[in-house]
Design a protein with these regions (language model features):
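Surface-exposed, low-hydrophobicity beta-strand/loop segments enriched in small/polar/acidic residues
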Residues: 1-175
Length: 175
């Protein structure tokens, strides 16, 4: 008998299944959980970690962090050499995108004190700066004009209510 786990997420993926994949990240710290909607990546040892503004490759955590079974979702070990890995179990499932549309509620975005950094249509999506409070690490952030060295993971295409939609690429563009 196989056991099945299901997840809901605040992250909305607006794409055909054939246009994206999920990247499995084995989370080293099995005592804390990661909110969905945060950018995650691999560390140099192959484990998952919160991404920062210097990472060129980043995935969006899809697994719901408020589910009663979140420890099962994020803390179960998985075998990265296995040819079959269920989406529902073992580590984090990061959305791996190449020009797909994602939507993340505004409450999950990093918003600096300046209104110039508020998400708006046409702004670039980056990762909260390292100087941001630790509680904001890995959150998506918006910038109007890419400065030299900035890594952009997409552009905001629309805002509906409190939900921010953007075209997402897991391989960032560095300016």
């Amino acid at each position: 008998m196989t056991q099945e786990r299901k997840s809901e997420s605040i992250v909305t993926i607006n794409a055909k299944f054939s246009s994206f994949n999920f990247e499995k990240l084995n989370w080293r710290d099995r005592t804390t959980t990661v909110e969905e909607g945060r950018f995650v990546t691999h560390d140099t040892s192959g484990y998952g970690r919160l991404a920062d503004e210097t990472d060129l490759i980043a995935y969006v955590n899809f697994l719901v962090s408020s589910a009663p079974s979140v420890q099962d979702f994020q803390s179960d070990p998985f075998d990265p050499t296995s040819p079959v890995q269920a989406l529902e179990g073992g580590g984090l499932s990061g959305v791996q995108g190449g020009g797909i549309e994602l939507a993340i509620p505004l409450a999950r975005w990093y918003v600096a004190a300046s209104p110039a950094n508020d998400p708006a249509v046409g702004k670039h999506v980056t990762i909260a700066p390292g100087a941001a409070p630790a509680a904001d690490h890995g959150k998506p952030a918006a910038v109007a004009a890419p400065a030299a060295g900035l890594i952009s993971f997409g552009v905001i295409t629309k805002i509906r209510g409190d939900t921010i939609f953007f075209m997402y690429n897991s391989i960032g563009t560095q300016y």
